[in-house]
Curated annotation (Swiss-Prot):
UniProt keyword terms in alphabetical order: Lyase, Purine metabolism
Provenance organism: Pseudomonas putida (strain W619)
Keyword Lipid biosynthesis belongs to the record: no
Function in brief: Catalyzes the catabolism of the allantoin degradation intermediate (S)-ureidoglycolate, generating urea and glyoxylate. Involved in the utilization of allantoin as nitrogen source.
SUPFAM superfamilies cross-referenced by the UniProt entry: RmlC-like cupins
Cofactor(s) annotated in UniProt: Ni(2+)
Protein's GO biological process: allantoin catabolic process; purine nucleobase catabolic process
Name by which UniProt lists this protein: Ureidoglycolate lyase
Keyword Lyase among UniProt keywords: yes
Family: Belongs to the ureidoglycolate lyase family.
Length: 167
């Protein structure tokens, strides 16, 4: 099994998969009579159908045992999905390009610094949320509407990957 190398999360490196949601280096302007900086349009919510709605949820995630064998990835073909850490803790991101099925050799891993969120574009393969802390909270922005919006792909034993945050 191939061990994934964990990359720092940057806008440039993550661009094929979605948006990095962060204030560092992002354009902003002043509002509220000069008392507030607005970091505008850090990500775009995608929905497939006009009747779909963008919704906001909170996910409370428990850590998985590490090193982790990556056995599956999921995708949301009908909308984007954003994860913004609420407690400031670093977390891990595992992604693969849009396609009929994820290609094991194209899977990449990233580490958020805890002040960065991610917005997966429609159809991007990704592992469910991966917290490093025992328990962590995330603000999630995704889509509500009709139709199946979660496909799962399970790797064969030869395709499985290892994720080790302590490397």
């Amino acid at each position: 099994m191939r061990t994934l190398m964990i990359e720092p999360l940057t806008k440039e490196a993550f661009a094929p998969f979605g948006d990095v949601i962060e204030t560092d280096g992002s354009d902003h302007f002043m509002i509220n009579n000069g008392s507030t900086m607005r970091f505008h349009k850090l990500a775009t919510v995608e929905t497939a159908e006009p009747e779909d709605k963008a919704i906001i949820s909170i996910f409370r995630a428990d850590a998985l045992d590490m090193p982790l064998t990556v056995r599956m990835l999921e995708r949301h073909p009908l909308g984007s999905q954003a994860f913004i850490p609420l407690l400031g803790n670093p977390f891990l991101i595992v992604v693969a390009p849009v396609g009929d099925a994820p290609v094991s050799g194209l899977v990449r891993a990233f580490r958020s610094n805890g002040r960065q969120g991610v917005n997966y574009h429609r159809g991007v393969w990704h592992h469910p949320v991966l917290t490093i802390e025992k328990r962590d909270d995330f603000l999630v922005v995704d889509r509500s509407g009709s139709g199946n919006n979660c496909d799962e792909h399970y790797f064969t034993e030869e395709q499985m990957l290892i994720l080790n945050p302590h490397q």
